[in-house]
Amino acid sequence: MSYVILDLEWNGSYSKVLHKFVNEIIEIGAVKLDDELNVCDTFTMLVAPKIGKKLCSKVKQLTKITNEELKDEGVSFIRAISLFSDFLGDGVLMTWSDSDLHALIENYSYYTGRTRLPFLSRYCNLQSYCEDCLDLHDSSCQLGLGACAEMAGVDFSEDD
């Protein structure tokens, strides 16, 4: 059994086709853990945007991704999701909250016209799981990743 923790970066772009804003995925990042929770592989891929042509300044600042990088190194969403599907295999997909899952479904639907992710058979929202484990059931206040890590004694200081 493997566990794949997914983290997406996206840019808010207005779709003239849908007449609404879309969280267009610009990067897919993931870490694969084995059944003993050891890191066994990583995945990162830039996705060339097709809906929006330029990154908003907040996204550039947060991600450190540039428009030039996306143009030069980004692949199509369909190619990126195909490679990610291969990486995921039969593993359990995990995200912190369900916002990445919603963005993934939204983008998949935009590019394929289908709302069901064919490669997704097992999923876990780690935020909900941790809130249950810590007996935190206040619907007005979601548990943040940093707070959860602190409660679990995880040190985020970077190695030099």
Residue map of PLM features:
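Extreme N-terminal starter segment of soluble prokaryotic enzymes
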Residues: 1-4
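Preference for bulky hydrophobic residues occupying beta-strand positions
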Residues: 6-8, 45
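Short acidic, Gly/Ser-rich segments with clustered Asp/Glu that frequently serve as metal-coordination loops
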Residues: 8-18
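Alpha-helix initiation/capping motif
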Residues: 19, 70-73, 138
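Metal-dependent phosphoesterase core characteristic of DEDDh/y 3'-5' exonuclease domains
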Residues: 21-28, 32-63, 85-160
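Metal-dependent phosphoesterase signature
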Residues: 60-83
